[in-house]
């Protein structure tokens, strides 16, 4: 696409420069939408501008704790998409502020501005009765959105993987230096979902191609935490021991580590790891959206190859050695 229609629909993607949000932005831009990318530091989100033609994708100042900035980004939009989430709290960015109050503010502002559609990216495991702050506030955010938009589409992905993920990348980086990969709750089940598939589902919802309701998004396979680590190690060709840490010990570690500025583990995260993170039986999902999700085996190699002993040249070096022997 080299030109943009004068009457192109407008999407306000709050969190549009984040891991999932940037792919949502790309998906909408490819479909001819104008996209306002809501973020706290627009000058650090200029990388989104080339996702479309000149003027199609623009970073816009938006703080989920500020009513005025949310109202501004929603004004004149055809769809508001909330794609903000955190794994640990920092300062004023608490779970309640970001995952419960933020969606509530966005939905109220969108409704006041006459926005037709609202899409919330939540997470599998959202539960108002959960003792886990992450899961509880995700559910509270969903309820707040549905109070304003009963016709909203809520997407609950399992763990999301892709080039910028903080799952495979983090553990692959650890494998560079550590002979052991420690995991808390090694038997916990996940249903990894490709970020591009989540973005495709979001775009369909924004365009009115998804019925109202909650969709649980999981990939085609279910794996234990330990199996995912073994898959990652096979891709990066490093032999490491995957050491399973019992949940009670993990909680103690989380209590200590969560005091760090950028904690690798928190007590809340350990609580989440005590439960499987897979699509519920009977839940609406990708099939209802006409999407066939991709498995991680065929994708993670494309971005984890840099963690191999010789990086992208590992295959070339091994082939040369094989010919010499």
Regions found by a protein language model. Give the residues of each.
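NAD(P)H-binding glycine-rich loop region in Rossmannoid oxidoreductase-like domains
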Residues: 42-105, 109-112, 124-128
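Mid/C-terminal beta-alpha module of Rossmann-like enzyme folds, strongest
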Residues: 2-5, 201-268, 280-325
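Conserved glycine-rich Rossmann-like NAD(P)H-binding loop of the short-chain dehydrogenase/reductase
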Residues: 33-43
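Residues forming the Rossmann-fold NAD(P)(H) cofactor-binding site
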Residues: 21-23, 100, 139
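Conserved beta-loop-beta element that borders a ligand/cofactor-binding pocket
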Residues: 122, 142-166, 173
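SDR active-site strand-loop-helix element
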Residues: 14, 38, 83-84, 118-124, ...
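N-terminal Rossmann NAD(P)H-binding glycine-rich loop of SDR-like oxidoreductase domains
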Residues: 4-33
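Substrate-positioning beta->alpha
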Residues: 105, 166-167, 185-207, 212-216
């Amino acid at each position: 696409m080299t030109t943009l229609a004068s009457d192109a629909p407008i999407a306000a993607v709050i969190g549009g420069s984040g891991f999932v949000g940037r792919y949502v932005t790309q998906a909408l831009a490819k479909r001819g939408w104008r996209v306002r990318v809501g973020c706290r530091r627009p000058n650090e989100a200029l990388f989104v501008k080339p996702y479309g033609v000149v003027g199609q994708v623009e970073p816009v100042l938006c703080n989920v704790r500020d009513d005025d900035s949310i109202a501004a980004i929603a004004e004149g939009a055809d769809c508001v998409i909330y794609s903000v989430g955190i794994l640990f709290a920092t300062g004023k960015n608490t779970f309640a502020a970001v995952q419960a109050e933020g969606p509530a503010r966005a939905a109220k502002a969108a409704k006041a501005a006459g926005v037709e559609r609202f899409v919330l990216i939540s997470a599998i495991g959202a539960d108002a009765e959960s003792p886990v702050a992450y899961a509880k506030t995700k559910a509270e955010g969903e309820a707040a959105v549905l109070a304003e938009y009963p016709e909203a589409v809520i997407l609950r992905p399992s763990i999301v993987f892709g080039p910028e993920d903080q799952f495979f990348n983090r553990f692959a980086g650890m494998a560079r230096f550590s002979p052991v990969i420690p995991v808390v709750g090694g038997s916990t089940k996940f249903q990894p979902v490709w970020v591009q598939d989540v973005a495709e589902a979001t775009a369909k919802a924004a365009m009115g191609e998804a019925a109202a309701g909650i969709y649980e998004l999981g990939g085609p396979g279910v794996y234990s935490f330990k199996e995912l680590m073994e898959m990652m190690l096979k891709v990066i060709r490093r032999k490491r021991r995957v050491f399973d840490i019992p949940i009670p010990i993990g909680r103690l570690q989380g209590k200590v580590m969560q005091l760090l500025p950028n904690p690798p583990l928190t007590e809340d995260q350990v609580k989440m790891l005590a439960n499987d993170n897979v699509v519920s039986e009977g839940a609406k999902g990708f099939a209802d959206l006409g999407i066939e999700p991709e498995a991680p085996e065929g994708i993670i190699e494309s971005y984890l190859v840099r963690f191999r002993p010789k990086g992208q040249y590992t295959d070339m070096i091994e082939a040369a050695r094989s010919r010499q022997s």
